[in-house]
Amino acid sequence: MSECGGRGGGSSSSEDAEDEGGGGGGPAGSDCLSSSPTLATASSAGRLRRGLRGAFLMARQRPELLCGAVALGCALLLALKFTCSRAKDVIIPAKPPVSFFSLRSPVLDLFQGQLDYAEYVRRDSEVVLLFFYAPWCGQSIAARAEIEQAASRLSDQVLFVAINCWWNQGKCRKQKHFFYFPVIYLYHRSFGPIEYKGPMSAVYIEKFVRRVMKPLLYIPSQSELLDFLSNYEPGVLGYFEFSGSPQPPGYLTFFTSALHSLKKALESTSSPRALVSFTGEWHLETKIYVLDYLGTVRFGVITNKHLAKLVSLVHSGSVYLHRHFNTSLVFPREVLNYTAENICKWALENQETLFRWLRPHGGKSLLLNNELKKGPALFLFIPFNPLAESHPLIDEITEVALEYNNCHGDQVVERLLQHLRRVDAPVLESLALEVPAQLPDPPTITASPCCNTVVLPQWHSFSRTHNVCELCVNQTSGGMKPSSVSVPQCSFFEMAAALDSFYLKEQTFYHVASDSIECSNFLTSYSPFSYYTACCRTISRGVSGFIDSEQGVFEAPTVAFSSLEKKCEVDAPSSVPHIEENRYLFPEVDMTSTNFTGLSCRTNKTLNIYLLDSNLFWLYAERLGAPSSTQVKEFAAIVDVKEESHYILDPKQALMKLTLESFIQNFSVLYSPLKRHLIGSGSAQFPSQHLITEVTTDTFWEVVLQKQDVLLLYYAPWCGFCPSLNHIFIQLARNLPMDTFTVARIDVSQNDLPWEFMVDRLPTVLFFPCNRKDLSVKYPEDVPITLPNLLRFILHHSDPASSPQNVANSPTKECLQSEAVLQRGHISHLEREIQKLRAEISSLQRAQVQVESQLSSARRDEHRLRQQQRALEEQHSLLHAHSEQLQALYEQKTRELQELARKLQELADASENLLTENTWLKILVATMERKLEGRDGAESLAAQREVHPKQPEPSATPQLPGSSPPPANVSATLVSERNKENRTD
């Protein structure tokens, strides 16, 4: 049965047996597996067949599994095929470009990027503007109308070509690799490209194109010469005589250098270079500022020799660089080669600028940051039209800059100032340095009946010299029509400001006691129409007694408090200086205004002046404090990054020379009367339903100084911990009565506050108790900000007796005592401050003496260096002359050596000819000798023949009849001589 069953199994049983044997069921199987690898292969194949057979049997028993497996496999194949087909990128070809400009536009539009055609048409035009654009670029689309407007005005002189440099099949895209669009290139014949990087405005583009078309200005007269030299841009003048030639030597080079100046200025980086020149005993740092074409070097041409002598130009082809404060220069042709690149480089490296034009591009930039780090900056926003023939406001700013930097009263600068003021001046003989001319008298100041008597108490340090002063606030028209200026009666606050400034000017009145009247004139603010005068005199005891009896002049003063707080009535006398109303003790005296000329050298807060076009960058002016809606976009601001403050000129005042001078003067003084400008967000409303009051810069005093306890939270949007306190302050506001307590907050990132109210960390909580605002308290930093802690803090520092109901009925005795204590403390504090200031003044005086000694030593060193320089120059001239002599001697010796070499060559040729002739002579001599020997031999033979006639003669060479036979060795000798001759050759 076992055998049948085995056979009955057929192949299946045999395969099972093989599998079992091969699988190592017994010792024999394992030996076979270890000995032969083919058995292992057969075993794995058997297992595969067995698995397939099991799957087939299962599918036959359960056909639904087979169908599911087949469906699953098909789904996997379809998914794999779909995934592989989507792996490749699907690229849609770009649409063909269309015309960017209209067909009626004067601009030639190469919208397919035909750069080769643009180069072809450029060769036939004198001036060409290439406008590279991208059709999708918003800046290119915005500049399209500006380009068309400029082309409509210049199409008869300039070829405008627009090129699509974005289409991937165009040559422009393949050859040009721009990082931004649009890009403007200008070509002047074969010179270029000159890239334009100015504002994309039609007037600016047209002005730039016209400057490329005409890079040189013709100077025909003295008036235009003064216009050229008084311009704020540096000027380079070239003198050329056209009488002898239509194109004098060097003119084309000078013309090309003017084009190079435009190109180099546009290619230069924003980092300025500093050059220091020394003239006399002072120096001025000259900084190169180049941006676009504004502020670049202007080039002019003079053809009149008499006009050229005014600027020290004598020879045709000379080049002159004008500088206002340093010595003007003439191009050193003996040092530098007269090329366009050298002239341009020399002018850019040695130029001197009064102020700089700024053009922020609107993106991230360090332009303003780099300029503000140099020191205080005066920003002037003015509406600028580049195409205008004249710019009166810029002329006034130029006049201010010239006076501000004219530290030594240079006569050339004074003449230029007279020309800017349109003052008739004598005809110029030369622009050489002369004695400084007298400055024009300042405008007179008309005093108005607004004077007050100032009583200096005995505790003041200089009361021993002047203890009675008369303060007068004066009004002046400042050059305007008297009818247009009103003279209002001054207020108490104006007099208080004058008093504050008066005490800051204490050193002005520190003199020996005298009965004479000593007066001084000061500016109270940056308004050119407001001055105050202080006239002081020492009053004796008799005079003092007389004054005491006169209408109570020196009555006990009153102490003024803030109008927003409750005042305590003080009846006791005080030692605080006070102001009397309309008390005239002294007659009117003449007053003189402060001198503005050379102020930059007399202050430690020298200003750098910058100009911005308000038509383009008024947003920056608004951020500095200018009104957003105004008819005339003129604005001035001083920014001092070191002091973290900035000041603005009153927008109600006109931007002109007098206002700018007063503005700069008030900033330059040691104790500036200018008030720091605070920038805040929009005015916040105080609706009744809001529990927390939002405070701004404008509403800070109104909220904090109100007759309530105020808890103020300082926060900022970028402070991550600040929002977590909102619910705490909302609960606090709900728990406290709103009629006696105010919870407020202020965003310090958008609102500036006075320095005494600024904080150094966020969040910060300040508490201002009612009626004691000067005793504000800061919440402890080491205590968590929670509702219970805030309530304890408020209850601890608030005064229950200071409620509004008790304030009106509170006794005045305690208030008077506290105020007396405060006043005594204030007086002692002021005395200490005065002593500190005097010590500082003495130290400054000592430092001044040291600086003067250092300056004197520096002057001596400079004088010594100049002498050494002159000695070196003399040595250099001697060496130069000696070098020229050596050069001439070298050339002479060279010529002699060349002549000697020629003669040696002739001798060599003659020697060669002599050698040849000598050879032939040797041959001839040898031949003659052989002939002689032959004759001797013939004679001997004849004698022998006579002796032996019967002997036969030997055979010889045939001879001519009548000739003697040649010797036997003649031919051999000739051959040897010829061989020698050949070897000699």
Curated annotation (Swiss-Prot):
Query: What protein family does this chain belong to?
Result: Belongs to the protein disulfide isomerase family.
Q: Where in the cell is it found?
A: Endoplasmic reticulum membrane
Q: Where is this region: Disordered?
A: 1-38, 935-985
Q: How does it sit in the membrane?
A: Single-pass membrane protein
Q: Which residues carry this modification: Phosphoserine?
A: S828
* Protein species of origin: Homo sapiens
What InterPro entries does this protein's entry cite? Thioredoxin-like_sf (IPR036249), Thioredoxin_dom-contain_11 (IPR052792), Thioredoxin_domain (IPR013766)
Ranges of biased composition (kind: Low complexity): 29-38
Q: In which tissues is it expressed?
A: Widely expressed at low level. Expressed at higher level in thyroid and prostate.
What task does this protein carry out?
May act as a redox regulator involved in DUOX proteins folding. The interaction with DUOX1 and DUOX2 suggest that it belongs to a multiprotein complex constituting the thyroid H(2)O(2) generating system. It is however not sufficient to assist DUOX1 and DUOX2 in H(2)O(2) generation.
Upper taxonomic lineage: Eukaryota, Metazoa, Chordata, Craniata, Vertebrata
Q: Supply the alphabetized keyword list.
A: Coiled coil, Disulfide bond, Endoplasmic reticulum, Membrane, Phosphoprotein, Redox-active center, Repeat, Transmembrane, Transmembrane helix
Where it mainly occurs, coarsely classed, is: endoplasmic reticulum
Gene Ontology CC: endoplasmic reticulum membrane
**UniProt-listed Pfam families:** Thioredoxin (PF00085)
Q: Which SUPFAM superfamilies match?
A: Thioredoxin-like
Composition-biased stretches, type Gly residues, lie in: 1-11
Give start and end of each Thioredoxin domain: 92-214, 649-799
Q: What is this protein called?
A: Thioredoxin domain-containing protein 11
